[in-house]
Amino acid sequence: MRVLFWMFIGFDRHATSEHLLSAIIERLCEAGHSVHIIQKDTGGDLPIIPEKLSRYDVTTDVIPYQAADKGNFIARYLAELKYINNCKKFIASNYDAVFIQSNNLAGFAVKAIRNKLPKAIVTFNVQDIFPYNVVFSGTIRKNSVMFCVLAGIQRYGYKHSDHVITISEDMKDTLVADETEVDKVEVIYNWSYQDEPYENVDLAPVAHVFKKDYFNVVYAGNIGVMQNVDIIIEAAKLMKDDNDVWFHIIGNGVYREKLELRASEYGIKNISFWPMQPPELAPVIYSAADVNVIPLIKDVYKTALPSKTATCLACQKPIIFAIGMDSKFGQKCMKEAGCSVVESDHPDELVEAIHKILNGEKDEKAGKFFRKYCGITENSGKSAEIITS
C-alpha cells in the first residue's frame, strides 16, 4: 500500500512523539508499504528523515510553519489551521491509507483527506482529547459557544475516520461518551525506545544532578498548567524538614518560573530546578530517580496520558501517579505494575506515598508490565496493521 503519513510536528526538531511516529513508519516499511510523510519545517537542524528511516522507501514534503506563542490559544489554533491549508496541495490522490497525527483540528484535517481520497483508509491518532483538555485547564468553559464549535470539529474528524487510535482506556471512554463509535476506537499504549526494560543504566551523564546521600524524588517533563507540577511543590513544602529527601524538577515550560518563585516563598531548601534534558537522557534520569512522579491536573487522565509513562515503567523505579484514583489506567498500573496512585489535588497523599517508598514499601513489577503492554515492536506493529486494514 501507499501510505500518507501526515504529521503535525517536524523531524527537524526533537519532540516527545518523534520515537512513536518513526517506529510506526518503520513497521509500515518493514511490512512492504511505501510511506510519504507530510511534516512541518520548524527551522530545526535535525534530518527531515531520521537516519533509521533513510534505508526505507520513505519520501517527504516539508511545509514551512511559523509557531505561535504557546500562551496564545487562538493564535496557536490559527497557526495549525494555516498549516493544514498549506498542506492540501501536497495531498495526492493515489494513497491507499492515511495516518493523521493527533492534533486539535481533526475535522479540518480529515475533511482535507476525504476531499482528495474518499476511498482511502483513514486513521486518526488521539494523544490528547481536545477541547476537553483545555476545559480542565480552565482555558475555556464546557458548553460555551467556543467549546461546542471546537468539539464539533473534532467529532467530525473522528466520525469520518475509519479508525481512531488512542492511548488509554480512560481516553477511549471519553471518546465513546463524546459520540465516537466504540468499535472504531483502539487502545494502544505508547512505548519507550526499546522492547526490553532498562537494566544497568550508566548514570554518569546525570551524576551532577542527583545527590547520592538523598532519596531523590523526580519530575521530568514539560512544566505547564496541565502537568500539575504544583502538587510536587506542595508536597515538598510539607517535607521541607525531611533532611534525607531531595526534590528535582527537570524541564521547561510556561509555568516553571511561577513554581520556582513559590518554592522560594515557601522556603523549600531541598529542591532543585534543572533545564530540559535531551530525549536520549530520559532513561538515565528515570533510572537515577528513587521515585518518579507523574502528575496531571484533576480529571485530565480522561483526556491525556504523559508520553514519558512507558519510559518510566521501563526504568523499573517506583512510580507515583498523581492523576486520580478513578483512572482505569492508574488502577491497572497499581494492580499489575505495583505503582502508587493518589489524587491530583491531595499533596498529603503524595507525601504519604513517598514515605512508604522511602521506608521500603515497594512492589516492583513495572518491568513485567512494560514487557506485557508497552513493547515498541509489538505496539507500533499493531498501529501499522490498523492503518493498513
Which residues are covered by each model-predicted region?
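Nucleotide-activated donor-binding/catalytic signature segment of Leloir-type glycosyltransferases, i.e.
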Residues: 248-250, 257-281
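Carbohydrate-associated surface elements
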Residues: 41, 170, 188-191
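Membrane-proximal helix-turn-helix segments that form the acceptor-binding/catalytic region
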Residues: 85-88, 108, 112-116, 144-166
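Acceptor-binding helix/loop patch of EC 2.4 sugar-transfer enzymes
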Residues: 8, 12, 65-73, 120-152, ...
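Nucleotide-sugar-dependent
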Residues: 227, 278-285, 292-313, 319-331
